[in-house]
């Protein structure tokens, strides 16, 4: 049931290039509070006004947003994003769920065709390609062949989805990285809907770095796959109206600093500030000196600094970027006219600015060349402190900034033979150097900077050691076009940075294997070797299992460290080598390109027709994609033999009516965890360990170890993913004596794989909980980090704090998030994890309130109070329905 929109009275007409458009004109509300609102909140306001029907979106919601100054962080609002963005690791399980929902819809007597996206959905296949082959001119071709061999089942399923679901566009493998493709091609900036109705573009994506689009002035952030599926099916998102931190930029970046240095600085500062669950909106004259690509780099890492968004309102630079990337003049004109008419066009040089919850300031001129690491993206180190910091980490106690080595261990070296030559390496040896990730490959200034540095190095005859795994994996074919046009691909190739693929690759751990002699040497001497990458995450175990120190850096610094061969170097005092041209030592400063030269190269080599040429072919696919044979029809014909695509159990026993959720009594603790447990720890994306439960399952199905592929590629199969839950080899569980995916089966004291213990608990009818520290679930927006625990029988997670997306995912799967009271944790309460737990939460949903106190008791006589992290009333409904998808399915059936 819907009613007429009470705000139709503010509908207005906009003329642009002889075309007439309609829009909901916020100025016609004649409310002085609008001008004070942050730009990001104005976009939420427009959505509420346009979608108001007093059923899903109410007039009270509009008033709450107008009154943001007094209601921020106090009220819940509905939000209807304009579109949904997927990548294949999270997109495959989303489409699997939609296919399973169609089956359930038919079983329960409904129309399966009702399960169809109601908003545009774009899926870019970018997570499957790996750096199997590198340092050769045909690496791209070889890696793509291997990718199709490994993933033909998944790709076939996605191709079926493209024809089965209306409004689902799929960019085939090799198109680029989802967020760069979104920035350069997919993003509309302003949507043109039915009846020429204009409204702001907005997006939610099943990848936490969806925020990259904030650099273009588009509202967008990462959500769990299950929440995205609900949005696809027309369900408004329920969210707490966020506080907005205003971050003022003054001055401009010094010549030697890059956008990467800036984002690592911003990430460090905002993590210290604490912005989880908040919007960050950038303002001040300094912003006007940054290109859209610079801004997108900063927005990309919003998950790393903890914010829901890192938002840059649109300005003239935004309009120029749209033109430079080949958007049509007609679109650009109505975009500019609409944003100006709607009060969404920003003048960063203006002295006036919106009211913010709180403000911060950064003088851009103070930014210096930087890296972050060795284990977290917000642990920034200035380049001139890098050598000292790394050596300090070697001897410091094991932790985020320590490896706990003794003085004797620090002296260890390893000698090995590679391609008939002997090499000796020590701690800090660079073994992976990757120009990777949409964070940086979308930005011509740092990419061409790397190319120019490579050119200068080659002119001096400098080389990169052949055992170092170097790779170049840009986020779109546009990079290849401008590298080719500028002549800079050739020097990069000479240093080993041949094109390896268009996808996430090393940034998400798809780094492939190291050379065998090198890997054996590292393992034998237990060396702390390093990776240097232009990515956005460096959590332990993510980039490669053998690399314990990983540093985020700009593309030019990636090339520099590859040349150096070690992170244990002071570039100011130690040369990269001796010039074959002059016979003199060559320092980094001698080959670092000037900002003027970089800008000249951008002007001459990055051309609008490159974007048009690359993206005009995106719908055509490639030969391998086009030759894929796929089934047709509304319902997917599940193949029980498939180890990639499997009909999940989420809806198989679901009934039309809702049953009361059972009480949690005498539950055992499956894991007792510490701080900063990431979604990589909970549901790894990388290679499947040959000794794991998932490996045993695959072998039982006749899959050879060389064909195991990665956990990320297997997310369409629940049987593998439940066995891969908590299977990270670096997970630290206090119920196990050593690091790794084991736990104690409490009833007998037996040590076993976590997944085996979960299966044993379930077979004996025991409920499960997890104890955890702060920032539980940080990292990627990985729905299997909630689906896996759900299938393992985990009913509740008790933590000091939760990362935003993961908390939402837990609720979306019907798992209860409980938060310890301030100052308390498992240790202070004397909990070992060997107790049995009773969670005193009412089973009647009408008795449950958001944020209420929930008492937990144990069989040892201990009791403590926790905070229920159902943050909005609708989340109580999701839990009562055993998850958001069951809730939506029942809604569609009724």
Swiss-Prot record:
Matching Pfam families, A to Z? Aconitase (PF00330), Aconitase_C (PF00694)
A GO term for molecular function: aconitate hydratase activity
How the cofactor is bound: the record states: Binds 1 [4Fe-4S] cluster per subunit.
Answer yes or no on keyword 4Fe-4S: yes
GO CC annotations, alphabetized: cytosol
Give an example GO biological process. Answer: tricarboxylic acid cycle
Where in or outside the cell?
A: Cytoplasm, Cytosol
Its Enzyme Commission number? 4.2.1.3
Disulfide topology = none
Keywords from UniProt, A to Z, are: 4Fe-4S, Cytoplasm, Iron, Iron-sulfur, Lyase, Metal-binding, Tricarboxylic acid cycle
Keyword check for Coiled coil, yes or no.
no
User: What are the binding positions for [4Fe-4S] cluster in this chain?
Assistant: 438, 504, 507
What is the main EC category here? lyase
The catalysed reaction is: citrate = D-threo-isocitrate
Query: Highest taxon of the source?
Result: Eukaryota
List ligand-binding residues for substrate.
87, 207-209, 537, 542, 781-782
PANTHER family reported in the protein's UniProt record = ACONITASE/IRON-RESPONSIVE ELEMENT FAMILY MEMBER
What family is it from?
Belongs to the aconitase/IPM isomerase family.
Q: What function is annotated for this protein? A: Catalyzes the isomerization of citrate to isocitrate via cis-aconitate.
What protein name applies here?
Answer: Probable cytoplasmic aconitate hydratase
Species of the source: Dictyostelium discoideum
């Amino acid at each position: 049931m819907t009613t007429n929109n009470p705000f139709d009275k503010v509908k207005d007409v906009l003329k642009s290039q002889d075309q007439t458009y309609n829009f909901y004109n916020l100025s016609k509300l004649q409310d002085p509070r609008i001008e004070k609102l942050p730009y990001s909140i104005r976009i939420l306001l427009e959505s509420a006004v346009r979608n108001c029907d007093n059923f899903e979106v109410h007039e009270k919601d509009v008033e709450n947003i107008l009154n943001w100054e007094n209601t921020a962080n106090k009220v819940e609002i509905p939000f209807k994003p304009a579109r949904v963005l997927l990548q294949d690791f999270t997109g495959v399980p989303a489409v699997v769920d939609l296919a399973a929902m169609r089956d359930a819809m038919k079983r329960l007597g409904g129309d399966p065709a009702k399960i169809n996206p109601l908003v545009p959905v774009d899926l870019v296949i970018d997570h499957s390609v790996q750096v199997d082959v590198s340092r050769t001119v045909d690496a791209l071709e070889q890696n793509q062949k291997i990718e199709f061999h490994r993933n033909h089942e998944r790709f076939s399923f996605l191709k079926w989805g493209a024809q089965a679901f209306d409004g689902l566009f799929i960019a085939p493998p090799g198109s680029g990285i989802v967020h760069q493709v979104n920035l350069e091609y997919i993003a509309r900036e302003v949507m043109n809907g039915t009846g020429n109705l204009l409204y702001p573009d907005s997006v939610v994506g099943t990848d936490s770095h969806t925020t990259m689009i904030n650099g273009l002035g588009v509202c967008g952030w990462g959500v769990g796959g299950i929440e995205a599926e609900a949005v696809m099916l027309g369900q408004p998102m329920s969210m707490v109206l966020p506080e907005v931190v205003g971050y003022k930029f003054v001055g401009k970046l010094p010549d030697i600093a890059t956008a990467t240095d800036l984002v690592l600085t911003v990430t460090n500062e905002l993590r210290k500030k604490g912005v989880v669950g908040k919007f960050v909106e950038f303002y001040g004259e300094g912003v006007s000196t940054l290109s859209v690509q610079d801004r997108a780099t900063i927005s990309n890492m919003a998950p790393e600094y903890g914010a829901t968004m890192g938002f840059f309102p649109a300005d003239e630079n935004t309009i120029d970027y749209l033109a430079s990337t080949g958007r049509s003049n007609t679109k650009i004109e109505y975009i500019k006219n609409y944003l100006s008419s709607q009060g969404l066009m920003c003048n960063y040089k203006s002295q006036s600015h919106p009211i913010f919850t709180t403000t911060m300031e950064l003088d851009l001129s103070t930014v210096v060349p930087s890296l972050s690491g060795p284990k977290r993206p917000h642990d920034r180190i200035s380049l001139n402190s890098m050598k000292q910091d790394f050596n300090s980490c070697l001897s410091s106690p094991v932790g985020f900034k320590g490896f706990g080595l003794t003085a004797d261990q620090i002296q260890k070296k390893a000698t090995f033979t590679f391609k008939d030559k002997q090499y000796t390496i020590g701690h800090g040896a660079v073994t992976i150097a990757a120009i990777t990730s949409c964070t940086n490959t979308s930005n011509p200034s740092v990419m061409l900077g790397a190319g120019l540095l490579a050119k200068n190095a080659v002119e001096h005859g400098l080389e990169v050691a052949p055992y170092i795994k170097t790779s170049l994996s840009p986020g779109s074919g546009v990079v290849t076009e401008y590298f080719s046009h500028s002549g800079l691909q050739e020097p990069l190739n000479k240093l080993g940075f041949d094109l390896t693929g268009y996808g996430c690759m090393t940034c998400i751990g798809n780094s492939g294997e190291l050379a065998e002699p090198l890997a054996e040497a590292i393992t034998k001497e237990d060396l702390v070797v390093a990776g240097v990458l232009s990515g956005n995450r460096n959590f332990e175990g993510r980039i490669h299992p053998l690399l314990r120190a990983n540093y985020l850096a700009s593309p030019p610094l990636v090339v520099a460290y590859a040349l150096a061969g070690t992170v244990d170097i002071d570039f100011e005092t130690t040369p990269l080598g001796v010039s074959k041209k002059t016979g003199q030592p060559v320092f980094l400063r001698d080959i670092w390109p000037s900002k003027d030269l970089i800008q000249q190269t951008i002007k001459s080599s990055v051309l609008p027709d490159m974007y048009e040429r690359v993206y005009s072919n995106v719908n055509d696919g490639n030969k391998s994609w086009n030759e894929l044979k796929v089934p047709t029809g509304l319902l997917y014909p599940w193949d029980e033999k498939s180890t990639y695509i499997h009909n999940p159990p989420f809806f198989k026993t679901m009934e039309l009516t809702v049953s009361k959720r059972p009480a949690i009594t005498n539950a055992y603790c499956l894991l007792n965890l510490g701080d900063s447990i990431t979604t990589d720890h909970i549901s790894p994306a990388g290679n499947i360990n040959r000794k794991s439960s998932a490996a045993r399952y695959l072998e039982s199905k006749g899959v050879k170890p060389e064909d195991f592929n990665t956990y990320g590629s297997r997310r369409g199969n629940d049987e593998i993913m439940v066995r891969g839950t908590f299977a990270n080899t670096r997970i630290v569980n206090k119920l196990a004596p050593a690091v790794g995916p084991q736990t104690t089966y409490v009833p007998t004291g037996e040590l076993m794989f976590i997944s085996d213990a979960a299966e044993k608990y379930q077979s004996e009818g025991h409920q499960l909980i997890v104890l955890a520290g702060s920032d539980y679930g940080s990292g990627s927006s990985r729905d299997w980090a909630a689906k896996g625990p759900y299938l393992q029988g985990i009913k509740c997670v008790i933590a000091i704090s939760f990362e935003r997306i993961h908390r939402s995912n837990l609720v979306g799967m019907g798992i209860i998030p409980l938060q310890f009271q301030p100052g308390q944790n498992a240790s202070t309460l004397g909990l070992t994890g060997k107790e049995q737990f009773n969670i005193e939460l009412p089973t009647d949903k009408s008795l449950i309130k958001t944020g209420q106190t929930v008492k937990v008791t144990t069989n040892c006589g201990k009791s403590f109070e926790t905070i229920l992290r159902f943050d909005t009333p609708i989340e109580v409904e999701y839990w009562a329905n055993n998850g958001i998808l069951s809730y939506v399915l029942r809604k569609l059936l009724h």
